Amino acid sequence: MISDFDRRRPVVRIVLGSTQFAVFLGVLVVGLGPILWTVKGALSPTQELIKDPVRLWPSQPAWAVLGKAWSDLRIGHFLLNTVLLAGGSWLVQLVVCFMGAYALSVLRPKMGRFLYGAVLATLFLPGSVSLVALYLTVLDLHLANTMWAVWLPAGAHAFTVLLMKRFFDGIPRELFGAAQVDGAGPWRLFWQIVLPMSKPIIAVVSLLTLMGAWKEFLWPMVAISDTEAHPISVALPRLAEFAEENTVIAGMFLALMPPVLVFIAFQKYIVRGVGFTGVKG
């Protein structure tokens, strides 16, 4: 630890400033590096991309490659599939996990501790362990090759329940007690107290859910056999066999932009929600 007196010394201030700048620069390179390389690869001719892959910027940017990737790889069609799959997964997971966390944190049933432990126990199970059982269940319910096969399993997400429960645990119990004295039941507590106060955690959970659903690869590939209904994460590797390298990278860039823009648009709410989640409970 550095005392306030030492912080006022010129040498210490220079060292601290240099260290902070170096750390910030490193984080910036690690975070933006892959995105910038994707932009560079998308605008580079295929021959230049192969001969000089570490070049910082193409000698003659080929902006037409983005349009070619959009039309040849049918990026718009597969992006629409991805939006539908991610949106449905987000809605199902938000409703199911919100209700589950509300019941465990606010209603607190008699077997609440046991149920909470059972939910957390699923965090230790790799997804590959339950893949076969999940697929057989989808077949039994005749949901294979439909979007419901992706939407419904998204509701069973223990980590989302954990995040929401921790947030709800931080709401003062006195609010619930006062509302119950006024005759409020479980649904009134939910609609008038819990839901209005949950905007920060809803923003965080929405981001995590959408990002996870957007990049999901294995389960959509297994559950949906129709190639026309595949999301962009499944379609791009298949289409890469028939397209040039720069066209594939341009498709990757176009697929990357929607979640990046969503994060930029809702960054304020997401950062605030992460802070609340880490402090409360």
Regions found by a protein language model. Name each.
Residues 2, 8-11, 16-281:
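A structural signal for multi-pass alpha-helical bundles of membrane permease subunits
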